[in-house]
Amino acid sequence: MNTKEKIKVGILGATGSVGQKFIALLANHPWFEISELAASEKSSGKKYKDTVNWIIPNELPKEIGVMKIKNCTPNLNCKLVFSGLDSSVAGEIEKDFAQNGYTVISNSKNHRMDENVPLLIPEVNPEHLELIKHQKFNGGAIVTNPNCSTIGLTIALKPLLDNFGIESVNVVTMQAISGGGIEVMKSDVVKNNVIPFISGEEGKMETEPLKILGEFNSNKISFANFSISAQCNRVFVFDGHTECVQIKLKKKNTTKEIINIWENFKSIPQIKDLPSAPKQVIHYYEDENLPQPKYQCDIDKGMAVSIGRLRTDNLFDFKFVVLSHNTIRGAAGGAILCAELMHINSLL
């Protein structure tokens, strides 16, 4: 595609941490160009650079900085919007956009478990996009990105479920402060600390993977049939969610077999060479000290999942460690990959 053919996109919640990450990742995208920025009424009418508390290491693009912010109402000059809105307001705003003919790709939790809304990880459940045909939004649609901690876990589980079957999973997370948004990042409470509770997080991790890994049958999803128990902690790391996983499988196998399956896992985004897709979805590390957020978080531009420390377990069958970038793979980058998948399927 040349520049003139790029698809215009808008960003809802453009001044927040996820909205900023959308801007950084879309700045030089080969298929999409930012045409609209929308945020709260207090920011409306102001230049973006004059109202945003820019926290992204990348420099704010000049052409974005001078754009005027609009209200989050469905009169934007685009037909695709990425939503980084807070869940306190996202539900009705996203629905309003969809009912007015916009395609909404949302990072918010509000519509994730709706019956006809895809909860999408492009490498895991691309067929779930068929649910869009059963939405009643007058030409619009809603597609959701899973919770940031759900994505790394579910990518690790997908090849295991397909090859061996899963009986049960236990996961303990160590989640970066960037996952809590700007207010958490600015808070003194998280400094040199571990907070053993993240509101609503454990419920998401125990249910979202079951929908994502579920089987699509003509017009609905039959959830995957295994149990997940989760404990979620906020730790003093800026980026990168680390998860310690225990798993019981239905078929016997070896660590060598599992590692081989992980390292060779690929799906439509890799086959079609989508712009945001990692070349290798899962990287396995033999070094028992890895993966670590400091060193593996940005592998493949933050879109790959890193796994290490696979070994047998006394209570389950195996245990291992998963790492993924929470604001790229787990938020804005994952949502952009969803849009790319939709584009090649003529759904935009």
Pin down the residues of each PLM region:
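Charged docking surfaces used in two-component/phosphorelay signaling
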Residues: 177-348
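N-terminal Rossmann-like NAD(P) cofactor-binding subdomain of oxidoreductases
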Residues: 1-197, 220-221, 226-227, 305, ...
